Amino acid sequence: MTNSTFSIAKTTKPFGVQNFGIIEKILRNRYGFFEEIREGIDLQAKMKAMLISSVTFFALYGAVMGASSSLWQTMSSAVKLPILFVATLFVCVPSLYFFSLLFGSNQSLSQSLTVILTAITVTSVLLLSCAPITLFFLLTTPSQYQFFKLLNVAIFSISGLMGIVFLYQGIKVVSGSEREGATTRKWVLIMWMFVYAFVGSQMAWTIRPFIGAPGTPFELFRQLGGNFYSNIFYSIGEVLGLFIVR
């Protein structure tokens, strides 16, 4: 075996390791990662690795959520949770990209998409890191459906908030030298974050359930009606003993 062949064999990593390795790169050196996005370095490879990693992590956490009910619910949630985030991404990306262009941004669509995927990947990592906590409460409070639902809402909120922090930092770095319309783009980004959260919560409500209700047969989807926010309000009321959700 020649030295060059040995070198290739030594440095080549398995496909999965290459994709999941990007997680460590983001978490350890986020600003260096954002600088690479600004320079347009390996954007396609970055997007592919982050998409594979985040879909995998979302599927694993979705399976933990669905495990509260049945095997069918476990498999359903493992499929639907990645769909939720990917669908929300593609619904919301065009608005951020074109509004940013309108107010002077020079970012390409690939750069914008890569930064947003970074935020989604961070969210997926944090969700998966909370999976043992979710599993613990699943095993120790098996009959507390509303509590388990609120626990997951809290975990999603915290993980999503950290993802938004990464998104905000990433946009600032990638847009670093662009002064024209910088203040307006900042407010566009802030408003877009609220839109993204609203679309995501409504999307989740549309393709629910992710957690099967006790005593009910498996449902792939539920009938539309009500909304996410009122349901959370009633769930809080039931947990506090104020009333019972029917």
Where are these regions (language model features)?
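A glycine-rich, hydrophobic loop/mini-helix early in the fold
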Residues: 45-112
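Helix-boundary and loop/linker segments of multi-pass membrane transporters
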Residues: 39-40, 70-71, 182-183
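Sparse recognition of residues in long alpha-helices and their boundaries
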Residues: 45-46, 132-133, 223
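N-terminal juxtamembrane cytosolic/stromal segments of multi-pass membrane proteins
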Residues: 1-51, 228-246
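Long, intrinsically disordered, low-complexity regulatory segments adjacent to structured domains
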Residues: 188-192, 196-246
